Amino acid sequence: MDCDGEVDGGPLRQCAVSRAHKPPEELIRFVAGPGGAIVPDLARRLPGRGVWVDATREAVVAAVRKGAFARSLKRQISVPPDLASMVERLMARRLADALSIANKAGLVVAGFAKVDELITRGGAAVLVHAADAAADGVAKLDRKFKALADAGGKPAPIIRELTGAEMSLAMGRPNVIHAAAVGGGAAHRLIEEARRLRRYRLGQEPGGGAPPPVNQTQDVHD
């Protein structure tokens, strides 16, 4: 294994808590910053020796509690006491940024009527509802979206990981509750960032399995 936790002969990394070997996308990389404080490297691009931890809140909390960062780096470091919450905020920001970028590119519509119209035209690739959206509006849009997706043999990804305030800030307009993105790279990034945030928050499902991926015909928030 190399100094960054890579298993010899492959791209797998070893979790500093469970010691399990997993692909990088199922882990979070941390590095020591210039001041000696541990820093989440969600994009996996920061220089320096990395410490890899399973991408769940539970694992990050355990890494802090067990001193896994100092042990892996073999040096004294400073670990923020709210590291697990910091990671969650950064993941939510990445999802909001993905929504913002897609919106600026003209690939997102917002508002119940516009989302409903895009679904009807078959142009919606992913729905984004605020976590605090009213259940009736969500249900109406979801039923139509899933029915059309089922008829076409396509997935119906639905994201509910951001609050209305977070969606409004990302899209630069007030009171955003419902949004939809057309297909392409922007929609794919939305789905992947939501999947990552959801897995971090929920960890393992009862029974030991991982949470199902966002890009199935289901609500990522259920």
Please give the residue ranges for each predicted region.
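N-terminal cysteine/histidine-rich coordination modules
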Residues: 1-67, 71-75
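Arginine/glycine-rich "motif VI" loop of SF2 helicases in the C-terminal RecA-like domain
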Residues: 20, 120, 145-154, 172
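Short active-site oxyanion
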Residues: 49-50, 105-106, 124-126, 152-157, ...
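A solvent-exposed beta-alpha-beta segment
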Residues: 125-126, 133-140, 150-160
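Short, solvent-exposed amphipathic alpha-helical segments in soluble enzyme
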Residues: 142-147, 195-196
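Helix-rich interaction surfaces within compact, conserved domain-sized segments
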Residues: 158-212
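Charge-patterned, long linear interaction tracts outside catalytic cores
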Residues: 209-222
